[in-house]
């Protein structure tokens, strides 16, 4: 389902899609990077909804996701996915990263999302190698889309380097 995947160089907060995925931390308290940008652009409504979720279930475990409204963003929802911190590659990081994408897509299907934008989860402050993360993300998303009603998945990459790495991984997807 590679044809449903688009790569975009830009800022994820500017995307006009049904759902934007946030690279969240397990405490669900806004941080830096993508998380900080989404909270800033979306306004306090997102943090308020996350506070209710925290009160109900604590945080969100690594490899899982929760959904909120999108506040002031041009989306209906924000899906807060918790990717793994890179610890050298021998601590189930690959499976946890794949799970963060899959759980986000399952929530998207549950909420009838047709268009969704992902950042490169775990590759910023969490230190996951971008080449490895791009291959995992694109493979998992492509496989998931086979049985999904989601029409378009955008990977929105902020840096030139991330865009180039994802482009290369995208070209290799069917090989």
Swiss-Prot record:
Belongs to the MacroD-type family. This is Macro domain-containing protein TTE0995. The lineage of its organism: Bacteria, Bacillati, Bacillota, Clostridia, Thermoanaerobacterales. InterPro entries: Macro_dom, Macro_dom-like. Residues 1-174 form the Macro domain. It comes from the Bacteria.
């Amino acid at each position: 389902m590679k044809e449903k995947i688009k790569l975009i160089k830009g800022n994820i907060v500017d995307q006009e899609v049904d759902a934007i995925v946030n690279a969240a931390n397990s405490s669900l308290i806004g941080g830096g990077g993508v998380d900080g940008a989404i909270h800033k652009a979306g306004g306090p409504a997102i943090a308020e909804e996350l506070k209710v979720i925290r009160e109900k279930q604590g945080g969100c475990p690594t490899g899982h996701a929760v959904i909120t409204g999108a506040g002031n963003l041009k989306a209906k929802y924000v899906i807060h996915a918790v990717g793994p911190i890179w610890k050298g590659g021998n601590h189930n990081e690959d499976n946890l990263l794949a799970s963060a994408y899959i759980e986000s897509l399952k929530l998207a299907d549950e909420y009838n999302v047709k268009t969704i934008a992902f950042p490169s989860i775990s590759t910023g402050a969490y230190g996951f190698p971008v080449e490895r993360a791009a291959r995992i993300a694109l493979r998992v998303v492509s496989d998931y889309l086979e049985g999904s009603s989601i029409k378009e998945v955008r990977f929105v990459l902020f840096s030139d380097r991330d865009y180039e790495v994802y482009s290369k991984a995208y070209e290799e997807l069917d090989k």
